[in-house]
């Protein structure tokens, strides 16, 4: 574990302030749930909690079913990384940090569909992950809501060459409905 050299005191209500630099680096937002662990050496460990982690196997099976039925690659993400995928290399994408653009889409709390080409003649693409070598782009994505909170998203994705063909047609109705259904279903599973 890397030592940061920052010391904080606990206030009379038992609160500890996590420095802004650490929150920014670890992508900890206001209101994010944290798990608290202790060990035998007297350490207190804070770990980001992802509600989707309870459904990783289930989300993977759902993504696999969508891929087999409809033929488009699917990724399920929490607020930080890709947690399940089908139709794309799991080794290449699982546990990879989502791109800043995907994070903003999740924050936006609404359906995203790729626009294809913009008015300047250039393509507007949203990469799935931060890794430029793994060129996979969102065709459509829907945030997953549970009890009013956004906890991630389900996305139909495509590699660079297939992205243009899929978005130029403008016929994304099927993908959109299936992705919306998947997001709603996974959200309901977490509420149950």
Q: What is each residue range found by the language model?
A:
Residues 138-145:
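A short, aliphatic-rich beta-strand micro-motif
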Residues 63-74:
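Short regulatory alpha-helical segment in sensory/regulatory domains of signaling proteins that mediates
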Residues 73-86:
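Short hydrophobic alpha-helical segments used for membrane anchoring or interfacial signaling
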Residues 56-65, 96-99, 152-192:
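Juxtadomain coupling helices with adjacent low-complexity linkers
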Residues 14-26:
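Short beta-strand-centered segments at strand-helix junctions
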Residues 85, 92-130:
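Regulatory sensory and allosteric helical modules in signal-transduction proteins
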């Amino acid at each position: 574990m890397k030592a940061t050299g920052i010391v904080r005191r606990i206030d009379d209500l038992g609160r500890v302030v996590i420095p802004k630099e650490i929150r920014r680096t670890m992508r900890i937002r206001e209101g994010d749930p944290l798990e608290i662990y202790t060990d035998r050496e007297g350490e207190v460990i804070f770990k980001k909690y992802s509600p989707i982690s309870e459904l990783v196997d289930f989300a993977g099976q759902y993504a696999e079913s969508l891929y087999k039925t409809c033929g488009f690659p699917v990724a399920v993400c929490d607020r930080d990384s890709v947690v399940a995928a089908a139709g794309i290399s799991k080794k290449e994408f699982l546990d990879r940090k989502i791109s800043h653009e995907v994070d903003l889409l999740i924050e936006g709390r609404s359906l995203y569909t790729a626009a294809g080409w913009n008015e300047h003649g250039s393509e507007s693409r949203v990469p799935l992950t931060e890794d430029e070598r793994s060129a996979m782009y969102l065709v459509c994505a829907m945030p997953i809501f549970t009890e009013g909170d956004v906890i991630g998203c389900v996305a139909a994705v495509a590699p660079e060459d297939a992205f243009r063909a899929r978005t130029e047609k403008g016929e994304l109705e099927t993908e959109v409905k299936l992705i919306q259904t998947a997001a709603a279903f996974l959200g309901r599973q977490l509420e149950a």
